[in-house]
């Protein structure tokens, strides 16, 4: 998925990007590629967990500002955890099948969230 984002690049980041000849969007793309619940929870010794940890800390700090159906969140997080546990136990493949199964749960959760938001909008008409 591709999206256009307008961003005010802070001076410190822009300075480093200039020094190292890296475009700011490349930094953000690299960061975005590393945000992954399935990888975060299946590769506990992995070195690319920091982006997801940052995302989790952001959620924790912005808890009052997000509109999350906590019942739906609890249901899908439990399903996600159960799915990962089963897949990790059944397959000795360094979490490959667990990550794929985890992504499927995340996709189902996303569909449920979108359906709930659409229902909310349509019910208001």
Go through each PLM region and give its residues.
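C-terminal non-catalytic accessory extensions
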Residues: 28, 98-125
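Short amphipathic alpha-helical heptad-repeat segments
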Residues: 73-89
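An amphipathic, hydrophobic-aromatic interaction surface with interspersed Lys/Arg
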Residues: 12-14
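Short Lys/Arg-rich basic patches
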Residues: 1-9, 18, 47-48, 53-74, ...
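Short, basic amphipathic alpha-helical segments that act as recognition/interaction helices
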Residues: 20-49
């Amino acid at each position: 998925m591709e999206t256009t984002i307008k961003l005010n690049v802070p001076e410190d980041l822009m300075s480093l990007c200039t020094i190292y000849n890296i475009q700011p969007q490349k930094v953000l793309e690299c960061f975005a590629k590393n945000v992954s619940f399935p990888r975060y929870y299946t590769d506990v010794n992995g070195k690319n967990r920091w982006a997801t940890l940052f995302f989790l800390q952001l959620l924790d700090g912005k808890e009052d500002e997000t509109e999350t159906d906590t019942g739906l969140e609890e249901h899908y997080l439990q399903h996600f955890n159960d799915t990962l546990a089963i897949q990790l136990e059944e397959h000795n493949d360094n979490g490959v099948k667990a990550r794929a199964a985890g992504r499927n749960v995340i996709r189902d959760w996303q569909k449920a969230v979108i359906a709930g938001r659409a229902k909310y909008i349509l019910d208001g008409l």
